[in-house]
C-alpha cells in the first residue's frame, strides 16, 4: 500500500475551524473529497482543497499512482503558533487579540 503526504504549515486559520472541514473528508475518495470542498462555504475548505490537490499531484508525479484509486487515508489539523495583538479600548485600556494559526497534514493512498 502506497501513501503520499502533503503539508501546509503556519496557516492563518484556527485549528478548531480547520478540523470541522477535515472531518468531512476523512476516509473519502479524493474526487468525492474535492467535490465536498469545492462547494463548502467555509474558509478552511479552500485551504484544505489546495493541500489535498498537492497530495494528489505528489502521488501522481512521485509514485505514478492512479488518481481514481486514491482515498484520503489520514488528514489532521494541529494547532500552530499564536500571534498576540492588542486592540484599543475605552479609558486607555487594551484587550488582547490572539490570531490563531494551524498546520494541515494530508495523506492519500489506496
UniProtKB/Swiss-Prot annotation:
**How is this protein annotated for GO cellular component?**
cytosolic large ribosomal subunit
Q: Which GO terms describe its molecular function?
A: rRNA binding; structural constituent of ribosome
Gene3D superfamilies per record: Ribosomal protein L22/L17
Q: Which domain of life is it from?
A: Bacteria
Arranged from A to Z, the UniProt key words for this protein are: Ribonucleoprotein, Ribosomal protein, RNA-binding, rRNA-binding
InterPro entries associated with the record = Ribosomal_uL22, Ribosomal_uL22_bac/chlpt-type, Ribosomal_uL22_bac/org-type, Ribosomal_uL22_CS, Ribosomal_uL22_sf
Q: Name one GO biological process term.
A: translation
Q: What is said about its interaction partners and assembly?
A: Part of the 50S ribosomal subunit.
Question: HAMAP family, per this entry?
Answer: Ribosomal_uL22_B (MF_01331_B)
The function of this protein is: This protein binds specifically to 23S rRNA; its binding is stimulated by other ribosomal proteins, e.g. L4, L17, and L20. It is important during the early stages of 50S assembly. It makes multiple contacts with different domains of the 23S rRNA in the assembled 50S subunit and ribosome.
Which family is this sequence assigned to? Answer: Belongs to the universal ribosomal protein uL22 family.
User: Cross-referenced PANTHER family, in alphabetical order?
Assistant: CHLOROPLAST 50S RIBOSOMAL PROTEIN L22-RELATED (PTHR13501), LARGE RIBOSOMAL SUBUNIT PROTEIN UL22M (PTHR13501:SF8)
**Protein name per its UniProtKB record:** Large ribosomal subunit protein uL22
Source organism per UniProt: Janthinobacterium sp. (strain Marseille)
**Taxonomically, what lineage is the organism?**
Bacteria, Pseudomonadati, Pseudomonadota, Betaproteobacteria, Burkholderiales
